């Protein structure tokens, strides 16, 4: 029997990067935060401005962007994040290996039902989902997002 984890939220001040001078140092520090947040299965992170300190105005944006980037499975990162200066060192950061980060698979390796993070795409007039398989899979259902979402995959009998 699996014991459910309680919902855990964390508030993170933008001043947590005040001692880091370079973008590389800041990126590495945020990666450490992401790893700790993943280990303790934190579900929500609130980044807030610490008015009592003199922080750079883009530090909160950097923390938020890097945490979202690191929370995205590796197979979706190129689709969701264009090249930008704030992500200059993101490729050097270690993956956080979160439970919802699934490995790349062949579609034939899916057994039963599986939940995977993916992105809804339009391909030749039809909706398909990129969920880190060797091919996109047809999308059945309704959605209002083309950003990252969780999708339930199920294999039909005989496939």
Predicted regions and their residues:
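Post-transcriptional modification and biogenesis factors for structured RNAs
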Residues: 1-159
């Amino acid at each position: 029997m699996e014991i459910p984890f309680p919902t855990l939220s964390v508030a993170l001040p933008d001043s947590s990067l005040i001692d880091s001078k370079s973008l590389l140092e800041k990126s590495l520090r945020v990666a450490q935060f992401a790893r700790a947040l993943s280990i303790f299965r934190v579900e929500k992170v609130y980044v807030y401005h610490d008015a009592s300190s003199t922080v750079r105005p883009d530090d909160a944006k950097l923390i938020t962007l890097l945490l979202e980037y690191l929370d995205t499975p590796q197979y979706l990162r190129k689709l969701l994040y264009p090249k930008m200066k704030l992500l200059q060192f993101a490729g050097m950061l270690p993956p956080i290996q979160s439970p919802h980060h699934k490995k790349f698979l062949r579609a034939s390796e899916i057994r039963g039902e599986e939940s995977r993070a993916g992105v809804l795409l339009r391909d030749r007039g039809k909706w398909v989902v990129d969920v880190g398989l060797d091919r996109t899979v047809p999308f059945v259902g309704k959605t209002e997002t083309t950003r990252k979402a969780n999708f339930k995959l199920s294999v039909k009998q005989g496939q």
